[in-house]
């Protein structure tokens, strides 16, 4: 199992806040690789390359290859810490994955056929309840994204998590928690009138 995206890293020997600050000034991003039965490893990555990788949405929902110290490990990106005011990545968390063990990942939702949906053609407005969904699956089954087809949604219609068409081997984590967790993903509602109410379908 080799990840589609490669992150080149080096072992980090200087720890602590002061060291992290110096490393960031030098264009490095501190990171940690943990889980999978192995010891946590502190790493350093090139900030420019990290930013370039993170610009691709698929990075967040793919098994990644982390190269460091002459070896490779497969992982998923679990957390990205960004500076609150600057376009700077402060820290990354990578979680090791095994081909035989299920992983839990947030996968982006891609909404299709919005403009051509039944409700929109009648003047309705699409509202998104979420932009990604947390799934459980084996690494080999991890989808890059999940499509939400709005073509047949009329005004007043709602698509819930249970309505999503999932690839084989993929389960939505929230649905395993019970019926009360079948949250709305998207809906089409009547446009609001000038008075603030909702107009009828035309």
Swiss-Prot record:
Gene3D superfamilies linked: Ribosomal protein L25, beta domain (2.170.120.20), Ribosomal Protein L25, Chain P (2.40.240.10)
Superkingdom: Bacteria
Transmembrane segments: none
Keyword Nucleus: no
GO biological process: translation
Record GO terms (molecular function): 5S rRNA binding; structural constituent of ribosome
UniProt entry keywords in alphabetical sequence: Ribonucleoprotein, Ribosomal protein, RNA-binding, rRNA-binding
Recorded GO CC terms: cytosolic large ribosomal subunit
CDD domains: Ribosomal_L25_TL5_CTC
InterPro entries in alphabetical order: Rbsml_bL25/Gln-tRNA_synth_N (IPR020056), Ribosomal_bL25/Gln-tRNA_synth (IPR011035), Ribosomal_bL25_b-dom (IPR020057), Ribosomal_bL25_C (IPR037121), Ribosomal_bL25_long (IPR001021), Ribosomal_bL25_short (IPR020055), Ribosomal_L25_dom (IPR029751), Ribosomal_uL5_bac-type (IPR020930)
Function: This is one of the proteins that binds to the 5S RNA in the ribosome where it forms part of the central protuberance.
Family: Belongs to the bacterial ribosomal protein bL25 family. CTC subfamily.
Subunit annotation: Part of the 50S ribosomal subunit; part of the 5S rRNA/L5/L18/L25 subcomplex. Contacts the 5S rRNA. Binds to the 5S rRNA independently of L5 and L18.
Name of the protein in its database record: Large ribosomal subunit protein bL25
Protein encoded by which gene: rplY
């Amino acid at each position: 199992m080799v990840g589609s995206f490669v992150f080149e890293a080096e072992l980090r020997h200087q720890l602590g806040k002061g060291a992290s600050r110096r490393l960031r000034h030098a264009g490095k991003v501190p990171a940690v690789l943990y889980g999978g039965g192995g010891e946590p490893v502190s790493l350093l990555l090139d900030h420019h390359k990290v930013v370039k990788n993170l610009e691709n949405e698929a990075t967040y929902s793919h098994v990644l290859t982390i190269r460091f110290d002459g070896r490779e490990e497969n992982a998923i990106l679990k957390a990205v810490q960004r500076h609150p005011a600057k376009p700077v990545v402060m820290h990354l968390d990578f979680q090791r994955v095994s081909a035989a063990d299920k992983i839990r990942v947030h996968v982006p939702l891609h909404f299709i056929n919005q403009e051509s949906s039944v409700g929109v053609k009648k003047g309705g407005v699409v509202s998104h309840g979420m932009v990604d969904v947390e799934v459980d699956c084996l690494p080999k089954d991890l989808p890059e994204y999940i499509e939400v087809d709005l073509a047949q949604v009329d005004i007043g219609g709602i698509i819930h998590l249970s309505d999503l068409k999932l690839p084989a081997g993929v389960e939505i984590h929230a649905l395993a928690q019970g019926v009360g967790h079948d949250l709305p993903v998207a809906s089409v509602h009547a446009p609001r009138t000038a008075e603030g109410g909702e107009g009828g379908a035309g």
